[in-house]
């Protein structure tokens, strides 16, 4: 099971608490897959919604394929996520009742198929972000101090 990472969504970990993760497939066109093989995708500001029992990914930007013809895809089109019915039901209930959102965390190839890891997330407040930044700075300072000490 080889996985080749296409892109990460680092902003999601900064802006949200990730409660649970799901792996989903996506319905794509041929030129989209070719663009993804080159690594031309952007997950920032993208999110998933559930409509009529189906999950869709919005604002996922996949650049047009350079060598595509007039049949090239729309870069910002809505893409259907392939999840099990129970997973979609769980996501829908959490979004509707408890104020969660679904954000894509990473996009990757798994055994030749494009997969997206989506996370059930709750938004962070500003003080949470500051607290995380302080912890990150402290960890970095400790790592630098240990490195200096071991020299």
From Swiss-Prot:
CDD domains noted in UniProt: SmpB (cd09294)
Q: Which keywords does this chain's UniProt record carry?
A: Cytoplasm, RNA-binding
Instruction: Extract one GO cellular component term from the record.
Output: cytosol
Q: Which family does it belong to?
A: Belongs to the SmpB family.
Q: Which InterPro entries match?
A: SmpB (IPR023620), SsrA-bd_prot (IPR000037), SsrA-bd_prot_CS (IPR020081)
Function of the molecule = Required for rescue of stalled ribosomes mediated by trans-translation. Binds to transfer-messenger RNA (tmRNA), required for stable association of tmRNA with ribosomes. tmRNA and SmpB together mimic tRNA shape, replacing the anticodon stem-loop with SmpB. tmRNA is encoded by the ssrA gene; the 2 termini fold to resemble tRNA(Ala) and it encodes a 'tag peptide', a short internal open reading frame. During trans-translation Ala-aminoacylated tmRNA acts like a tRNA, entering the A-site of stalled ribosomes, displacing the stalled mRNA.
The organism sits in which domain of life?
Bacteria
Q: Which cysteines share a disulfide bond?
A: none
Q: What is the native source organism of this protein? A: Geotalea uraniireducens (strain Rf4)
A biological-process GO annotation = trans-translation
Q: By what name is this protein known?
A: SsrA-binding protein
Q: Where in the cell is it found?
A: Cytoplasm
Give one GO molecular function term: RNA binding
Q: Per the record, a Pfam family? A: SmpB
């Amino acid at each position: 099971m080889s996985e080749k990472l296409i892109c990460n969504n680092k902003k999601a970990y900064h802006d949200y608490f990730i409660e649970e993760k799901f792996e989903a497939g996506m319905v794509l066109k041929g030129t989209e897959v070719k663009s993804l093989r080159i690594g031309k995708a952007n997950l920032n500001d993208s999110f998933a919604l559930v409509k009529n029992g189906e999950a869709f990914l919005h604002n996922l930007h996949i650049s047009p394929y350079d060598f595509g013809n007039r049949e090239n895809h729309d870069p910002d089109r809505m893409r259907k996520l392939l999840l099990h019915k129970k997973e979609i039901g769980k996501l829908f209930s959490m979004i509707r009742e408890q104020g969660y959102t679904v954000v894509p965390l990473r996009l990757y190839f798994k055994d030749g198929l494009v997969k997206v890891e989506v996370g059930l997330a709750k938004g962070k407040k500003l003080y949470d972000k500051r607290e995380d930044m302080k912890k990150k700075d402290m960890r970095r300072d400790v790592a630098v101090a240990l490195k200096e000490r071991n020299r």
